[in-house]
C-alpha cells in the first residue's frame, strides 16, 4: 500500500494523459471530478502538454538548422528524433531526405553572398556522394531522382539546365513546407502517452527476454545432452576399468601363490580394456601378449591429440564497413562494432586471430593513420551510450594484443580522447571502466607512459584512489596497476614528489587491502617512488616504517618480503641522480617480451541482440561486407618471452592485472628454482612484535599483530639472491632464469633500467633467444608468487552492469 501511495500521483497522471490523448472527454471529466472528491491530487501539468512543447522545440530546431544550412546539426537531430523504421521504410521520409541532402549540398552555392567557401563546398559534395553510395542508393532506380546522381560530378551545377529548378527560391520554400508538414505528423505520432510507451516497452522487453531465454535453453539442452553422453561413456569406462582392475588384482594374488597367467587370459583382459576405444574385432586382432604392446597403447590413449588446422575468416570490405560506422544509424554501428569485436575474441589464438588482427591493422580499421574530421575513433563521442560502449570494447580488444597496442598508439589524439572519455563518464559506468582498462594496457608502451605522465594523469589516479568506495574491484585493480606502471618511470616518480604527502597517504590506506594483487601493485609503487630522497624524507616524517611493519602478516611470506624490501628502500641513503634517465628514453626496448591475452569476459553481458530477421556477428560481416580474399598474412607467433623476477621483491616492471595473474599461474606450474630452505629464516631472536596500530588513515582495514623479519637477514639474503654466480647455481639447463634485479650502480647511484611496464595480461615463462621486431614494453614474470586470491578481485571479472535500456 505504501508503494501505491508513493507513486499514486504519477499513476493518476498517466491515466489522465491517456484519456486526453484518446479524446475521452466525458470520461476524463468524470475521472477528474472523482479524483477531486476523493482528495486525490492530479499533476498540474499533463505529460502530454510537456511532450507537445518538447515536440515544438525539436521542430523549431530542425527548421532553424534547415534555414541556416547547418548540415551537421540538422542530421544529428534527424537521426535522433525520426524513428529508424520510418527512415528505412517510409517512402515519404526517404524522398524528403533525398531532397534535404540536395538542399544542404548546394546551400553554399545559393547563399554565397558573393564569396564561395570552396572547402565547405567540397565537404558537402563529399557528404552527398557518400549518401548516394549508402542510404540514397535505394532510390537510384527512381526516374525522379536519377539526374541528381550526376550532381557531385558537375563542375558548375548552378549553370547546368538539369539543375535549374533546385537553385530557385520557390524550390527551397516548397521543400521547407514539406519538411514542416512531415515533422508535425511524425513528431506528433512519436509523442504517444507514457502509458502506451510503457506497455510497448514492456511487451518488447518481454519478447526480447523470451527470445534470449529460448536461445539459452536450446544451448543448455544441447550441452546437457552432450554432457550426458560423455558422462554415460565415462561411467561405462569406469565400471569396465573397475572390473578389469579387480581381475588383475586376482591375477596378482594368484601369481604370488605360484599360479601362472596364460597368454589367452592377458589377451582377454586387454581386449576388455580397449573395447570401448576401438571396435571389438580390432581389439581382438591385436596381439597383446607381445611385451610392451598393451602398455604402449595405454600411454598412447592419453596422448594429446594433434592440433587441427583452423580455417581463416573471409576477407571484408573495410571501406564499406568504415563508411557505415561513420554514417550509419546507431543500431547498425553497434552491431558492426559487436561483430568486429567478436571476430577477434571468438577466434582461435594463433594464426586465425593474428590474421584477423593484421587485416584490421592493414586496412586501418580504426583510422589511426588518418586525421579526417569524421572517423571511427570519433564514435567515442557518439551521443549513443551503446555506440560509445561498443567502441570502447573494440579498442579494449586491440589494447589487449601486443600488435594492437602498437597500432592504436600511432594515433596521437587517441590517448587524449580516451582520457577525456574517462573523465567525462559517470563514476560507475561500464564505459569508464572499459576505458580505464585500455589506458592501463597502453601503459605497457613507453611512449604512452610518457604522454600520460605529461598529461598529469598520475594526480587524477591519486584522486581516484583516495575514495575507493565508488570503485568496483575491477576499477580499483586497474587504477592502482596503471598508477604503479607510471611510477616506475623517473618522470613519474618526480611527478609524485610534487605532492608526496598526499600520494603516500593514499598508498598507505591501500596497504591493508584484502586483495593480494592490489597489495602487490601498492608495494611496487611504494618501492619505486621511495627511490626519490624527498619522498623518503616525507615518508619517514609520517612514520611510514611503523605503518609498513604493522602490515607484515604471519604466513604471507611474499608480502612480508615485499615490505622488508620497501623498508630497506625507505631507510636507504642513496641519492636520486636526475641526470640518469635511462628509463625515460623514448626508444621502445625489449618489446619482444610483450604478450597477448584477451580477458575472458570481454563479450560478457551484451546489451544488444539481433532481432528476428536481423543479421549480427559473423553473419552480418559475411553477408553485407564480404570483400575480396586478402587473407594472406603470415604472422610470426611470438612465444612466451621475458624473465622471471624473484617473488620476494615488490613489482619493478610494468604489469597488467590479468597478466600478473597468469604469470603466477605459470610460476606455480613450471615455476623458477626456489631459494634454499634457509632463505629469510626467522627466529624468536630476530622477530619484533608490533604492539599497537600505527597512526594511519586506513582505520577501516582489518589487520592483526604480526611479526616482521629483521633487515640483517634481508641484506645477506638479497646479496646472495641477486649475485650472478648464485643465480647460475640455482638454475638448471631447462629452468627459467631469475631476473637479476639487484639495483645496479652507476657512479654510486641506483639505476632502474631493467624495469619495464606491465599489464594484467599474459606473462612469459621462458626466455626468448632471438629478438623479434619491436612491439611494446614486455610482460615479465615480476610479480610475487600467489598461493590464493581473494574472491573480490582475484579474477578480472568486471563488475559491469550493462545498459538494459537499449535492448531494442
From Swiss-Prot:
The keyword Cytoplasm applies. Keywords: Cell projection, Cilium biogenesis/degradation, Coiled coil, Cytoplasm, Cytoskeleton. Its main location: cytoplasm. GO terms for biological process: cilium assembly; positive regulation of smoothened signaling pathway. GO terms for cellular component: centriole; ciliary basal body; ciliary tip; cilium; cytoplasm. Residues 579-599 have a biased composition (Acidic residues). It holds the Pfam family ARMC9_ARM. The keyword Transcription does not apply. SUPFAM superfamilies: ARM repeat (SSF48371). Residues 785-808 have a biased composition (Low complexity). It comes from the Eukaryota. It is found in: Cytoplasm, Cytoskeleton, Cilium basal body; Cell projection, Cilium; Cytoplasm, Cytoskeleton, Microtubule organizing center, Centrosome, Centriole. Residues 655-668, 677-709, 775-784 have a biased composition (Polar residues). Involved in ciliogenesis. It is required for appropriate acetylation and polyglutamylation of ciliary microtubules, and regulation of cilium length. Acts as a positive regulator of hedgehog (Hh)signaling. PANTHER family: LISH DOMAIN-CONTAINING PROTEIN ARMC9. This is LisH domain-containing protein ARMC9. It comes from Xenopus tropicalis. The gene is armc9.
Amino acid at each position: 500500500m505504501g508503494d501505491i501511495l508513493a507513486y499514486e500521483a504519477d499513476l493518476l497522471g498517466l491515466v489522465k494523459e491517456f484519456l486526453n490523448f484518446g479524446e475521452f472527454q466525458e470520461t476524463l471529466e468524470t475521472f477528474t471530478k472523482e479524483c477531486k472528491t476523493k482528495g486525490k491530487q492530479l499533476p498540474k501539468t499533463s505529460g502530454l502538454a510537456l511532450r507537445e512543447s518538447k515536440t515544438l522545440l525539436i521542430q523549431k530546431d530542425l527548421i532553424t538548422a534547415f534555414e541556416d544550412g547547418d548540415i551537421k546539426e540538422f542530421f544529428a537531430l534527424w537521426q535522433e528524433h525520426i524513428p529508424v523504421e520510418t527512415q528505412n521504410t517510409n517512402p515519404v521520409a526517404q524522398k524528403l531526405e533525398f531532397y534535404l541532402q540536395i538542399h544542404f549540398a548546394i546551400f553554399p552555392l545559393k547563399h554565397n553572398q558573393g564569396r564561395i567557401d570552396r572547402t565547405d563546398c567540397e565537404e558537402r559534395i563529399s557528404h552527398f556522394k557518400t549518401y548516394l553510395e549508402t542510404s540514397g542508393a535505394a532510390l537510384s532506380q527512381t526516374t525522379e531522382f536519377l539526374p541528381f546522381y550526376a550532381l557531385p560530378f558537375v563542375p558548375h551545377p548552378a549553370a547546368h539546365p538539369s539543375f535549374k529548378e533546385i537553385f530557385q527560391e520557390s524550390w527551397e520554400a516548397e521543400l521547407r513546407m514539406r519538411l514542416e508538414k512531415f515533422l508535425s505528423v511524425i513528431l506528433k505520432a512519436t509523442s504517444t502517452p507514457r502509458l502506451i510507451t510503457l506497455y510497448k516497452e514492456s511487451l518488447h522487453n518481454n519478447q526480447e527476454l523470451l527470445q534470449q531465454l529460448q536461445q539459452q535453453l536450446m544451448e543448455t539442452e544441447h550441452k546437457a545432452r552432450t554432457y550426458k553422453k560423455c558422462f554415460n561413456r565415462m561411467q561405462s569406462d569406469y565400471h569396465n576399468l573397475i572390473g578389469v582392475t579387480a581381475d588383475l588384482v586376482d591375477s596378482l594374488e594368484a601369481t604370488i601363490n605360484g599360479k601362472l597367467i596364460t597368454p589367452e587370459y592377458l589377451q582377454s583382459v586387454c581386449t576388455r580394456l580397449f573395447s570401448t576405444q576401438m571396435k571389438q574385432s580390432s581389439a581382438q586382432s591385436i596381439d597383446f601378449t607381445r611385451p610392451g604392446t598393451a602398455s604402449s597403447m595405454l600411454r598412447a590413449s592419453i596422448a594429446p591429440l594433434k592440433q587441427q588446422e583452423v580455417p581463416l575468416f573471409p576477407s571484408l570490405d573495410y571501406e564499406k564497413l568504415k563508411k557505415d560506422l561513420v554514417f550509419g544509424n546507431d543500431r547498425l554501428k553497434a552491431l558492426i562494432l559487436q561483430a568486429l569485436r567478436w571476430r577477434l575474441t571468438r577466434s582461435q589464438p594463433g594464426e586465425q586471430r593474428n590474421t584477423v588482427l593484421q587485416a584490421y591493422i592493414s586496412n586501418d580499421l580504426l583510422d589511426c593513420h588518418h586525421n579526417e574530421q569524421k572517423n571511427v575513433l570519433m564514435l567515442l563521442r557518439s551521443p549513443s551510450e551503446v555506440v560509445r560502449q561498443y567502441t570502447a570494447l573494440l579498442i579494449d580488444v586491440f589494447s589487449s594484443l601486443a600488435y594492437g597496442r602498437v597500432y592504436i598508439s600511432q594515433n596521437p589524439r587517441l590517448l587524449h580522447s580516451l582520457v577525456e572519455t574517462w573523465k567525462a563518464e559517470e563514476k560507475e559506468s561500464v564505459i569508464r571502466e572499459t576505458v580505464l582498462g585500455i589506458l592501463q594496457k597502453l601503459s605497457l608502451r613507453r611512449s604512452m607512459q610518457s604522454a600520460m605522465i605529461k598529461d598529469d594523469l598520475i594526480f587524477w589516479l591519486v584522486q581516484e584512489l583516495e575514495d575507493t568506495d565508488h570503485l568496483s574491484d575491477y576499477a580499483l585493480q586497474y587504477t592502482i596497476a596503471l598508477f604503479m606502471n607510471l611510477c616506475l618511470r623517473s618522470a613519474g616518480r618526480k611527478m609524485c614528489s610534487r605532492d608526496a604527502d598526499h600520494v603516500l597517504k593514499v598508498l598507505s590506506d591501500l596497504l591493508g587491502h584484502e586483495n593480494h594483487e592490489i597489495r602487490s601493485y601498492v608495494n611496487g609503487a611504494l618501492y619505486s617512488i621511495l627511490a626519490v630522497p624527498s619522498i623518503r624524507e616525507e615518508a619517514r616524517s609520517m612514520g611510514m616504517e611503523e605503518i609498513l611493519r604493522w602490515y607484515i602478516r604471519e604466513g604471507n611470506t611474499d608480502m612480508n618480503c615485499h615490505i622488508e624490501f620497501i623498508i630497506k628502500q625507505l631507510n636507504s641513503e642513496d641519492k636520486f641522480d636526475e641526470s640518469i634517465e635511462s628509463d625515460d628514453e623514448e626508444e621502445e626496448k625489449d618489446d619482444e617480451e610483450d604478450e597477448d591475452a584477451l580477458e575472458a569476459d570481454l563479450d560478457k553481458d551484451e546489451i544488444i541482440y539481433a532481432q528476428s530477421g536481423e543479421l549480427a556477428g559473423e553473419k552480418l560481416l559475411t553477408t553485407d561486407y564480404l570483400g575480396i580474399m586478402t587473407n594472406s598474412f603470415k604472422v610470426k607467433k611470438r612465444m612466451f618471452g621475458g624473465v622471471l623476477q624473484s617473488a620476494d621483491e615488490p613489482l619493478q616492471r610494468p604489469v597488467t592485472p590479468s597478466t600478473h595473474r597468469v604469470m603466477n599461474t605459470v610460476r606455480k606450474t613450471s615455476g623458477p628454482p626456489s631459494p634454499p630452505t634457509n632463505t629469510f629464516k626467522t627466529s624468536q631472536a630476530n622477530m619484533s612484535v608490533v604492539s599497537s596500530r600505527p597512526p594511519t588513515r586506513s582505520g577501516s582495514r582489518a589487520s592483526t599483530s604480526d611479526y616482521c623479519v629483521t633487515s640483517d637477514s634481508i641484506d645477506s639474503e638479497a646479496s646472495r639472491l641477486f649475485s650472478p654466480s648464485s643465480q647460475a647455481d640455482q638454475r638448471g639447463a631447462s629452468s627459467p632464469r631469475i631476473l637479476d634485479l639487484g639495483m645496479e650502480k652507476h657512479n654510486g647511484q641506483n639505476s632502474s633500467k631493467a624495469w619495464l611496464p606491465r599489464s594484467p595480461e599474459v606473462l612469459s615463462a621462458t626466455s626468448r633467444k632471438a629478438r623479434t621486431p619491436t612491439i611494446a614494453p614486455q610482460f615479465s614474470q615480476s610479480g610475487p608468487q600467489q598461493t590464493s586470491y581473494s574472491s573480490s578481485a582475484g579474477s578480472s571479472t568486471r563488475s559491469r552492469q550493462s545498459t538494459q535500456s537499449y535492448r531494442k
